[in-house]
Amino acid sequence: MNSTGFNDTDSALFSNTSFLSCCNVSSVVTDSGFVSAALDERSVFIMRTVQIAVMCVLALTVVFGIFFLGCNLLIKSEGMINFLVTDRRPSKDVEAVIVGSY
């Protein structure tokens, strides 16, 4: 077994860690770090507000759709009932009784 192969891979591993240690993520963050957090909170708040507004509009659309659909079905059912009911005219005897009771 050749020990130089192991030494080469070990040195390659350590060279990568030394490369990563020089370039840490803290250089990407802005000066105070709070500015990016405030902007992130603001964008999250705006996104949540927009989501709530969209859900309210969709809920109102569904509620009014069900309401108007129900009203339309009620009107149609009343029309069908009136169509099925035969037209009954009161007889003259009923009028005489009503007039006579006063």
From Swiss-Prot:
May be involved in the regulation of p53-dependent G2 arrest of the cell cycle. InterPro entries: Reprimo_fam. One of its GO terms (cellular component) is cytoplasm. It is a single-pass membrane protein. Keywords: Cytoplasm, Membrane, Transmembrane, Transmembrane helix. The keyword Transmembrane helix applies. The chain crosses the membrane at residues 50-70. Belongs to the reprimo family. The keyword Transmembrane applies. Signal peptide: none annotated. This is Protein reprimo B. It is found in: Cytoplasm; Membrane.
